[in-house]
Design a protein with these regions (language model features):
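N-terminal auxiliary segments of SAM/dcSAM-dependent transferases
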Residues: 1-23
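Conserved alpha-helix/loop element of class I SAM-dependent methyltransferases that forms part
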Residues: 48-66
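Conserved SAM-binding loop of SAM-dependent methyltransferases across substrates and taxa
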Residues: 77-89
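Conserved SAM/SAH-binding beta-strand->alpha-helix loop
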Residues: 97-99
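Conserved SAM-binding strand-loop segment of SAM-dependent methyltransferases
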Residues: 111-123
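A short acidic, Gly/Pro-enriched loop at the edge of an enzyme's catalytic core
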Residues: 126-133
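A short glycine-rich, Lys/Arg-flanked "PGG" loop and its adjoining helix->strand segment in the class I
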Residues: 150-162
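SAM-dependent methyltransferase
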Residues: 167-242
Length: 277
């Protein structure tokens, strides 16, 4: 317990990783899949009606031609892949969660959709002049550190054909992330563990960096404790333009979200469509 207190008493260094991977944990990934598929909540994926509106906007704004090849980075259970494939586009989805991909493959087979799903880390993308468009939805871009974002943008640029577009969304610099802490206990099957466990959660903010961290310490009945971290970089328009330009992109569209809501300086989220130069 003393060691755990000492670990949690310190503020983590920016983008310091957690003590275990979150997305590949077998139990957590199954619970995450359930959250993705819950139509009543935006906890992991957006609600079906929102996804439908986003896909409408993306098809128009990305100027996708019939049969265009599209890459979905961090595709999860394939909700966007399925919606786009049903419209006649050729989809490839990449995700690190085996549970989500197993569901996505089964759903595609049952629907007769020829989606290609790849099990892997999208940060290791290695394709060349392949896609007309790429997607990275639900703020995944801001989870990555500065070097990882820069490297990923270069890889996406390389994977796109000349003039190809990249659409993604992020949390805005206008969003407020106050520091807080809370705890919860479960005697049975919970999100983090299948047996009894305690969860100590806190949000740490670094306002000078427009960065925050959600930290979860999961304590099992044996006393074993594991700390998980999810980082969230917040972005201004200027920062986005700078990072995109460094990787060979031009910012074409900036909205408040992927349904095309007009952007204002008070918007808490930003959606971007950038074109490969």
């Amino acid at each position: 317990v003393k060691q755990l207190i000492e670990r949690l008493a310190q503020r983590p260094e920016p983008f310091a990783p957690g003590e275990a991977p979150l997305w590949t944990d077998p139990h957590v990934s199954r619970r995450m899949l359930a959250a993705h598929l819950d139509p009543s909540t935006d906890a992991a994926s957006r609600r079906p009606e929102t996804i439908a509106r986003e896909v409408d906007w993306l098809v128009r704004t990305l100027e996708l031609r019939p049969g265009a090849p599209v890459l979905d980075l961090g595709c999860g259970p394939g909700l966007y892949c399925a919606a786009l494939a049903a419209r006649g586009f050729v989809l490839t989805g990449i995700d690190i969660s085996g549970s989500s991909l197993a569901y996505a493959r089964q759903a595609a087979a049952e629907a007769g959709l020829g989606v290609t799903y790849v099990h892997g880390d999208y940060r290791e993308l290695d394709e060349h002049d392949t896609y007309d468009a790429a997607l990275l939805v639900y703020h995944d871009f801001g989870v990555l550190s500065d070097p990882d974002r820069a490297a990923l943008l270069l890889r996406i640029n390389e994977a796109l054909r000349a003039g190809g577009r990249f659409a993604f969304d992020v949390v805005s610099a206008a969003a407020d992330r106050p520091e807080r802490s809370e705890w919860s206990a479960s005697i049975g099957d919970g999100f983090w563990r299948s047996g009894p466990h305690l969860v100590l959660e806190r949000q740490v903010d670094y306002p000078e960096l427009a960065l925050s961290c959600r930290e979860h310490a999961v304590v099992e009945e044996t006393g074993t404790a594991t700390v998980y971290r999810i980082w969230e970089q917040r972005f201004s328009r200027e920062r986005l333009e700078r990072e995109l330009a460094a990787a060979g992109f031009v910012l074409e569209h900036l909205t408040a979200d992927l349904t095309g809501t007009p952007w204002t300086s008070a918007a808490e989220t930003l959606a971007v469509v950038a074109r490969r130069r």
